């Protein structure tokens, strides 16, 4: 990848969402076992310098159109001739002295989420936290959402960050997939168009209907952020999934667990509990006709989670009925095609984006990105925790992001602390919600 490449419509819409109070980046936070000598800042810079050619986008910055147009749709990616690894991989300033505490790490991450990436440079940065209380270290990888979505960022982490094993390094690269014949692409588009015409009206009615209850996370978003972390075992989620049966999925369990945590948090604050409509991103990678595997390729579906239901298994089965119906009818695929088509006309794309982000459409966003299936290490030290955080949206003061690593699920919470106070208590309530499900399914002690 070299020269100039126009910022595509979907990524331009994401970039345009950034305002004085809403950032456009995501964060990945890795907490790593101790290394002799502490965090390897110099070695990480050296590793990235050697590997960045694998991900050319990370050496590119945004440049205006030669025509002088200022809109995001007129921007181009171009190689950064002044790229400096030291400007992108830097020591984090988290403590006045001594090791960084967990609270200080969370405060630093919150400040990063509230900040902005320098648009004159490639839109990513890594802050290295050189010493934690237990001797370990951490890094906070900030990357703008207009560069990549969650699935793509995990591929980039494999390419850029994790240790490579001899088998990985010696294995021949998989051949690039051959593009389908032109007539096959045309035929696929006609078939999609026919399916779209048939399914769109019903899908739009199901997905784009107003939320009746007032959102507990609504309100005017400010400039500060608070973050919190929770975690659980994949085997715990799988136990609940298998015990529930009837096609319940791990993601159904996650949504029910988050719903149960929100219920606890609201009840403790004497807030009303109603139905929370959750916006669930759905990856469309490998489903596009050209086999695209880069950038942003996300759709979504809305799932009603009955917070008023006190029985955790009934709540889980209600969530499953919602997700199963939407998947069976192909709602995420239909919505992706609709908004992809609208996005080709920038004005319509902006209207569509505002519609799907309206506080009248959903309560909060809960994502689940599959991370590495095997344990990972950096410079020989185990990566023991891996969290993801995504930005909140106008009048949506809470966002929940889950990411797996080997046998664990890590959940990140990003919030406006004025509207969502004590987000750390919400994280604890989500862990308690899973414990409740384990108790009723005989899974204690897993």
PLM feature spans:
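Soluble acyl-CoA-dependent acyltransferase catalytic core bearing the H(X)4D motif
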Residues: 1-10, 29-396, 400-431, 435-446
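Intrinsically disordered, low-complexity linker and terminal regions at domain boundaries
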Residues: 13-17
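TRNA-binding/sensing appendages of the translation machinery
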Residues: 20-26
């Amino acid at each position: 990848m070299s020269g100039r490449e126009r910022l595509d419509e979907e990524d331009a819409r994401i970039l345009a969402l950034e305002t004085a109070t809403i950032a456009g980046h995501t964060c990945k936070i890795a907490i790593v076992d101790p290394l002799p000598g502490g965090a390897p800042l110099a070695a990480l810079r050296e590793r990235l310098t050697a590997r960045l050619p694998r991900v050319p986008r990370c050496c590119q910055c945004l440049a205006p159109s030669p025509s002088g147009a200022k809109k995001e749709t007129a921007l181009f990616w171009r190689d950064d001739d002044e790229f400096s690894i030291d400007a992108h991989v830097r020591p984090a300033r988290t403590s006045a002295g001594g090791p960084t505490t967990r609270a200080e790490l969370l405060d630093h991450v919150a400040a990063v989420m509230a900040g902005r990436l320098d648009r004159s440079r490639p839109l990513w940065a890594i802050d290295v936290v050189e010493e934690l209380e237990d001797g370990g270290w951490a890094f906070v990888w900030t990357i703008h959402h207009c560069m990549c979505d969650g699935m793509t960022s995990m591929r980039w982490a494999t390419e850029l960050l994790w240790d490579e094993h001899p088998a990985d390094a010696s294995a021949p690269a998989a051949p690039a997939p051959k593009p389908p014949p032109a007539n096959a692409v045309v035929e696929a588009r006609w078939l999609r168009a026919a399916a779209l015409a048939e399914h769109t009206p019903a899908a739009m009615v199901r997905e784009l209907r107003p939320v009746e209850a007032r959102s507990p996370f609504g309100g005017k978003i400010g400039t500060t952020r608070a973050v919190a972390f929770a975690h659980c075992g994949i085997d715990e989620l799988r136990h609940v999934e298998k015990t529930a049966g009837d096609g319940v999925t791990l993601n159904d369990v996650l949504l029910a667990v988050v719903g149960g945590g929100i219920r606890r948090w609201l009840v403790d604050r004497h807030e009303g509990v109603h139905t929370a409509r959750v916006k669930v991103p759905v990856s469309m990678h490998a489903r596009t006709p050209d086999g695209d595997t880069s950038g942003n390729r996300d759709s979504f579906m809305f799932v009603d989670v009955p917070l008023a239901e006190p029985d955790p298994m009934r709540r889980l089965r209600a969530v499953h009925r919602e997700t199963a119906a939407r998947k069976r009818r192909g709602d995420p695929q239909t919505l992706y095609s609709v908004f992809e088509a609208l996005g080709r006309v920038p004005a319509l794309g902006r209207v569509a984006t505002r519609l799907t982000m309206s506080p009248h459409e959903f309560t909060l966003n809960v994502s689940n990105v599959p991370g590495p299936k095997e344990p990972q290490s950096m410079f020989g030290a185990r990566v023991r925790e891996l969290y993801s955080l995504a930005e909140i949206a106008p009048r949506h003061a809470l966002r929940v992001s889950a990411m797996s690593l080997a046998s664990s699920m890590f959940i990140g919470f990003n919030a406006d602390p004025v509207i969502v106070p004590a987000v750390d208590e919400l994280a604890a309530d989500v862990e308690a919600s899973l414990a409740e499900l384990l108790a009723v399914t005989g899974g204690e002690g897993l």
